Amino acid sequence: MDYAAESLKKHYEWKGKLEMTPRAAVDNKEALSLAYTPGVAQPCLEIQKDVNKSYELTRRWNTVAVVTDGTAVLGLGDIGPEAGMPVMEGKCVLFKAFGGVDAVPLCVRSKNVDDIVNTVAMLAGSFGGVSLEDISAPRCFEIEKQLKERCDIPVFHDDQHGTAVITLAGLLNALKLVGKKIEDVKIVTSGAGAAGIAIIKLLMSMGLKNVIMTDRKGAIYEGREGLNPIKEEIAAVTNRNRETGTLADVIRGADVFIGVSAPGVLTGEMVSTMAKDAIIFACANPTPEIFPDEAKAAGAAVVSTGRSDYPNQVNNVLAFPGIFRGALDVRASEINDEMKVAASYAIASLVSDEELNADYILPAAFDPRVKDVVAAAVAEAARKSGVARI
């Protein structure tokens, strides 16, 4: 199938992938008076007395804003907010289909951090959570940081944290399969953008000690010239031996490669220099850092990509719907590391020890168990970590 042509045709037919459907019928005078004036004044007064009643008297309890500025849309780059709308609508469809969450796309016409933060913060009272999408690095880090400080609802940049949650889930099962522990392995990553940095931070919270991040200029280490503040922060806690050189230099002896960068950056020759039973996450889309066949021919034991036509797809749809479902169910004030880790373990648990093999370390995107298992784990973690409000 020519997905580009067929998708364009469908979008012309759909004229948008979302619509509003009322929950209150207004088919007679009495019903109208209850849903709108004069009856609607009473719930307004209740919310005026206690703003948290907005969760009980409106749809806020189940509604998430999906926010972008259109600067890093899929592999298309900076295409603008309006051009990003089809992706945001699609994300909203996934929220509903896979999490039962109502989501509203908000495409902001500004690249200014303060503009975006102020816009979202002023609208936060209309939503139960905020999902930041396709905002370029390093601005995405500052936008998320400021919004988390200003908003008392979950703010979650899926390009960072959704990818990190799925990667951790897959890694937990891959390490189990090859008999290694996260605290003992050497991991080398390619790509120092939003996803790459979030992955490293989450893995380090799980006990990872030996990790080297690389970018276009090679290994990142403390003191390297030209690092932006975000890379300086990660350099201070990674690459403890201050290894220098290219990806090919530092990947020697590594147990795990995690790529969120560009097509073809990892070669079979590089894989052959890695440790026995190497694990490869080649998540660049649509063309991975290395294709599974080449990686396995070079000695890799487990290979995961971001593509649906290969086994072990790293697909964020396994994470964000259930994470928000769980956070909304307990009216969490934030989505913290404890909740992310709980989601990773929940996803990993859906692959039983009997089923676990080199081509099956992650459940399928359409596995009907995912939402409920992830939501329950996230809600419980929110309660235990003190961010649940009901």
Question: Which residues are covered by each model-predicted region?
Answer:
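Rossmann-like adenosine-cofactor binding region
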Residues: E232-A301, R307-D309
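General beta-strand structural signal in soluble alpha/beta enzymes
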Residues: P105, S131-D134, V155-D158, T189, ...
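Solvent-exposed alpha-helices and their adjacent loops that cap or buttress functional pockets
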Residues: Y12, Y55-R60, K96-A97, M122-A124, ...
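Short, ordered loop/turn segments at secondary-structure junctions
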Residues: D69-T71, I79, V108-R109, D134-A137, ...
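Glycine-rich phosphate/diphosphate-binding loop of Rossmann-like nucleotide-binding domains
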Residues: L74, I79-G99, H157, V165-A262
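N-terminal ligand-binding/catalytic initiation module
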Residues: M1-V155, A375, A381, S385-R389
